[in-house]
Amino acid sequence: MKSSLPGALFQRVADWLRLLRAGNCAVVSLGAYTGYVAGRGGSLPQGVLVAASAALVAAWGNIVNDYFDLESDAISKPWRPLPSRRISPGSAVSASLPLLAAGLALGFLVSPLCGFTAVLASALLFLYSWRVKALGLPGNVLIAFLAALNVVYGALASPEPWRSLLPSAYAFLIILGREVLKGVEDLEGDAARGVKTVASTLGARAALRVSAVLLLAVVALSPLPLLSGYGALYALFAFGGVDAPIALALLKAGPEPRRAWIATRILKVPLLMGLLAFLVGGLA
């Protein structure tokens, strides 16, 4: 009996980390900190506070998303913590509220502007999970906007927040391009549920073209930061870690769901590498 306790505890912790989507929260934290650095923020404690605030609000949003997706996940993702009942919906909601409170409190601690921006982001996250996600393209646009807002959020704690415009544009275009392509991956299920994505309304090939335009816009933006002081480290991450994977994803993408699935997995790389490009470029 005693020997099973560590295993049970590990499983419990792992389930909560899956529910919170710890990896996603880490990327959100990185995005906010990147915005802070891009805006010439020089205080490590201030940057950590705004990054932690963003991660806590994101963790709350991830729980809310799974709560509203409980019925559909019971069919499509029964292994997730909530549909499998390894974590009860009530426990999840109860745990989410302190996360939200802490995230908002840290935001207001940084500045009133950051605090009110965190409140706005929280409201939009709730609306996304509750209603907008099921609308298809509006949900794609909203989640891309929230990714961009996260970068701006970090920059609002810095002296020159306008400098976050380029990294936030990166985030918006990459996320929106990927979300449109995911519509090809999920075409059959979205069509059956009446979700209005580009793919389900205009067809898979139209969605591929829209996604390609958005992602190629990222490639076109890549040289611009070099004109505003970013140097070789930025170029290394941007051209090698963003542009090259985008090119590979577009080559792999196709109207078949399997090919779209491969491309959307590749597109996880340029978002992370794009943030790192602006982070290391801003610190150099």
Swiss-Prot record:
It is found in: Cell membrane. Its EC number is 2.5.1.42. GO terms for molecular function: geranylgeranylglycerol-phosphate geranylgeranyltransferase activity; magnesium ion binding. InterPro entries: DGGGP_synth, Prenyltransferase_related, UbiA_prenyltransferase, UbiA_sf. One of its GO terms (cellular component) is plasma membrane. The chain crosses the membrane at residues 44-64, 99-119, 137-157, 164-184, 210-230, 231-251, 260-280. Its cofactor is Mg(2+). It catalyses: sn-3-O-(geranylgeranyl)glycerol 1-phosphate + (2E,6E,10E)-geranylgeranyl diphosphate = 2,3-bis-O-(geranylgeranyl)-sn-glycerol 1-phosphate + diphosphate. Keywords: Cell membrane, Lipid biosynthesis, Lipid metabolism, Magnesium, Membrane, Phospholipid biosynthesis, Phospholipid metabolism, Transferase, Transmembrane, Transmembrane helix. GO terms for biological process: glycerophospholipid biosynthetic process. Pathway: Membrane lipid metabolism; glycerophospholipid metabolism. Pfam families: UbiA (PF01040). Belongs to the UbiA prenyltransferase family. DGGGP synthase subfamily. Prenyltransferase that catalyzes the transfer of the geranylgeranyl moiety of geranylgeranyl diphosphate (GGPP) to the C2 hydroxyl of (S)-3-O-geranylgeranylglyceryl phosphate (GGGP). This reaction is the second ether-bond-formation step in the biosynthesis of archaeal membrane lipids. This is Digeranylgeranylglyceryl phosphate synthase.
